[in-house]
Amino acid sequence: NVIGCDSLEYNNKYSIDSIIDKPNFNFLNGDITNDKLFLEINKEEIDVFINLAAIVGDPACGLKPEKAVEVNYDATIKLAELMLNKDIDLFILASTCSIYGKNEIPLLNEETEGKPVSLYGWSKVLAEKGIKRLGEKGLPFSILRYATAHGYSFRPRFDLVVNNFALRALTNMDLTVFGGTQIRPFIHVKDMCKAIMYCISNIDKAKGEIFNAGNEKENYSILQVAKIIKEIIPSTNIKILEDIIDERSYSVSFNKIQNKLNFMTSYTIKDTVNDVSEAIQNHLIKDPKSKLYYNI
């Protein structure tokens, strides 16, 4: 049985329409900063709690800094405290490789000190520390530090770099690259879900651990991402702005999750470009500029 909780802040109820009437699915509409939702959650019998609730990304956190801290840290720790008292099997926190920030180390692993350059990164650092403190009190936890997300989904996000570049290339718009040398690891949304399932399937191995979730082969500079898209869509025009540089740059090792949980990703940036192309051709995305597809 699955219980889903969401505030539906982005008018995204349609993304669960296909499962809302399933007998083994229950939906709770609410914000994790609201005590009413906590009361509802506390009534449920829970084996595994997966905390995906967050104000995600640097721009979104910049627009709502107080809300970002409240959701990403305060409410997250409050939820974990509730789960500590419910004696669950596993609490999974969705974190981010953004905690590494601007880092000169060639390949970062889970032991590398975080150097976030944004509120989003800092809020996740604080959340991780809070979860680890509760772990010392008995909370069984796993933390997944996700690479940068991409991929077509029930509610595709076109404010994510790969998705945005794919959409722009497919609609004959320039790909604007700021600097372009900054490196990011990338992960498809389906592989993000897969990482969660691997933690649940291997609770004894996953418990008390932090995992970078992604694939070393998917560490790319932003310019490389643009060039991958141009390989698929040759008409793509890449515009580089050298005077605007993004300081966030890091390559990440994913050896731990591969070795400990036998986890490997299945999808690549090319899959996302092809999926977005197919969605546009099949008119599944009627208005790519709609606010439905953006968090900022």
Predicted regions and their residues:
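N-terminal Rossmann-like NAD(P)+-binding domain of SDR-like oxidoreductases, especially those catalyzing
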Residues: 1-140, 145
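Short aromatic-enriched loop/helix-cap "lid" or pocket-rim segments at secondary-structure transitions
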Residues: 14-17, 104-106, 154-157, 189-190, ...
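Conserved sequence/active-site signature of Rossmann-fold short-chain dehydrogenase/reductase
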Residues: 33, 99-100, 149-151, 192, ...
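Nucleotide-sugar-dependent glycosyltransferase donor-binding/catalytic pocket residues
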Residues: 34, 69, 151-155, 185, ...
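Short-chain dehydrogenase/reductase
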Residues: 61, 147, 210-213
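NAD(P)-dependent short-chain dehydrogenase/reductase
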Residues: 117-119, 129-184, 189-200, 227-232
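C-terminal substrate-binding subdomain of Rossmann-fold SDR/epimerase-dehydratase oxidoreductases
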Residues: 172-173, 177-296
